[in-house]
From Swiss-Prot:
Keywords noted in UniProt: Biomineralization, Magnetosome
One Pfam family matching this protein: HTH_17
Organism expressing this protein natively: Paramagnetospirillum magneticum (strain ATCC 700264 / AMB-1) (Magnetospirillum magneticum)
Protein name in the entry: Magnetosome protein MamR
Result of knocking out the encoding gene: When both copies of this protein are deleted cells have a weak magnetic response and make magnetosome membranes; the magnetosomes are less numerous and smaller. Deletion of just amb0973 leads to an intermediate magnetic response and still makes magnetosome membranes. Deletion of genes mamH to mamV (amb0961 to amb0978) gives cells with no magnetosomes and no magnetic response.
Coiled-coil stretches noted in the UniProt entry, renumbered to this chain: none
Induction comment from the UniProt entry of this chain: Locus amb0973 is part of the probable 18 gene mamAB operon.
Compartments where located: Magnetosome
More about this protein: This bacteria makes up to 20 cubo-octahedral magnetosomes of about 45 nm in diameter which contain membrane-bound crystals of magnetite (Fe(3)O(4)). Expression of just the minimal mamAB gene cluster (amb0961 to amb0978), including this gene, is sufficient to form a minimal magnetosome chain with small magnetite particles.
Length: 84
């Protein structure tokens, strides 16, 4: 009987933790100005497709540096884009 309560309690705790992580992912994404983001991360933060982000980079709308085959974007550049 006690083990049933322990299992149910741990399942509830796991569910609540998962819900908190999900809420944080949806509503708590904060762009850190000094952090460096990949184009994939930037697309998630901006709520657009990665190809759209690449287009904005290539047009000069978002400043980024190419490292190897990938672009790296400073968080402050994402904030600047969002404040336009």
């Amino acid at each position: 009987m006690i083990w049933t309560a322990v299992i149910k309690g741990s399942a509830l705790v796991t569910f609540v933790q998962g819900a908190m992580v999900l809420v944080d992912k949806i509503f708590g994404e904060e762009i850190l100005p000094h952090r460096i983001y990949s184009s994939a991360e930037a697309s998630q933060l901006l709520g657009m497709d990665r190809l759209e982000v690449l287009g904005l980079i290539r047009s000069g709308t978002i400043k980024a540096k190419k490292v190897g085959d990938n672009y790296r974007i400073l968080g402050s550049n994402l904030v600047d884009y969002m404040n336009r």
